[in-house]
């Protein structure tokens, strides 16, 4: 059980969100104009349905709120806003936060410890984030705190807790589980060889299936070039689940860039 020291400031609704400025981040640059329009429509609904709550003196403005909403809606661009029905609030700290964590061990003893967290996603509760890591999520780097926590929420739709297997057809579960565990083992092998700091995929992905799904969801949207060629079978499963192919967006964007350079000569 985690105790939260809430001192909150809620963002007020704004009918004039700065969408053009909000879209101007590397994470979203490869979306087509049609995809951007649909993402904005989802983000507007997100801001109508969810409360963004600033904690510990952090101040939200329209641009910050719009960018947060756009990133929340990127994973469900083709799934629909109803896939985010499992929570009503997004709590935002200014930086990674300390919480009091209590747990009971196998013999019934209760332990307490202060833990530093970047974010949290609860089955029947809010998503908790921090602004420093949200800012780092704007880049196309493989790290994205918002997508990580959204992936946990999507994962939880398949049961009482995150398992690494989202809500997919039953016939696909065994194959998904096989490919996910194969990826975890591959990532762990790389960690054993070069160490956590030098691994090309965040070592957190090797800790358990739920974290592997969440971490690889970050790479799926923000660094597909690191995910797709390394785990092609699992990549295809992610494409089928999210109904998106970010690597295709990347190729199209690169081709358009090459064409533009040729046209200038």
From Swiss-Prot:
**Which cofactors are required for activity?**
Zn(2+)
The reply on keyword ATP-binding is no
> What EC number(s) does the entry state?
3.4.11.-
Binding of Zn(2+), residues: 111, 148, 152, 211
What function is annotated for this protein?
Involved in the modulation of the activity of the glucose-phosphotransferase system (glucose-PTS). Interacts with the transcriptional repressor Mlc, preventing its interaction with DNA and leading to the modulation of expression of genes regulated by Mlc, including ptsG, which encodes the PTS system glucose-specific EIICB component. Shows zinc-dependent metallopeptidase activity.
Instruction: Write out the similarity annotation.
Output: Belongs to the MtfA family.
Protein name stated in the entry:
Mlc titration factor A
């Amino acid at each position: 059980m985690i105790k939260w020291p809430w001192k909150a400031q809620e963002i007020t609704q704004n009918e004039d969100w700065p969408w053009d400025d909000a879209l101007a981040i590397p994470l979203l640059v490869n979306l087509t104009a049609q995809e951007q329009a649909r993402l904005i429509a989802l983000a507007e609904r997100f801001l109508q349905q969810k409360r963004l709550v600033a904690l510990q003196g952090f101040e939200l403005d329209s641009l910050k709120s719009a960018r947060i909403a756009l990133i929340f809606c990127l994973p469900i661009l083709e799934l629909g806003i109803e896939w985010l029905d499992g929570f009503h609030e997004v709590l935002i700290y200014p930086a990674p936060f300390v919480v009091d964590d209590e747990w009971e061990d196998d013999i019934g003893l209760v332990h307490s410890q202060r833990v530093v967290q970047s974010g949290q996603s609860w089955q029947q509760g809010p998503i908790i984030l921090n602004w420093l890591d949200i800012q780092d999520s704007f880049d196309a780097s493989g790290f994205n705190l918002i997508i990580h926590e959204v992936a946990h929420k999507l994962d939880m739709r398949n049961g009482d807790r995150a398992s690494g297997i989202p809500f997919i057809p039953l016939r696909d579960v065994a194959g998904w589980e096989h490919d996910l565990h194969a990826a975890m083992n591959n990532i762990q092998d790389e960690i054993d060889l070069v160490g956590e700091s030098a691994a090309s995929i965040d070592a957190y992905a090797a800790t358990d299936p739920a974290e592997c799904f969440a971490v690889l969801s970050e790479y799926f949207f923000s660094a597909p070039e690191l995910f797709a060629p390394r785990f092609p079978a699992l990549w295809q499963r992610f494409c089928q689940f999210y109904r998106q192919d970010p690597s295709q967006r990347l190729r199209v964007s690169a081709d358009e860039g090459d064409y533009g350079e040729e046209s200038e000569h």
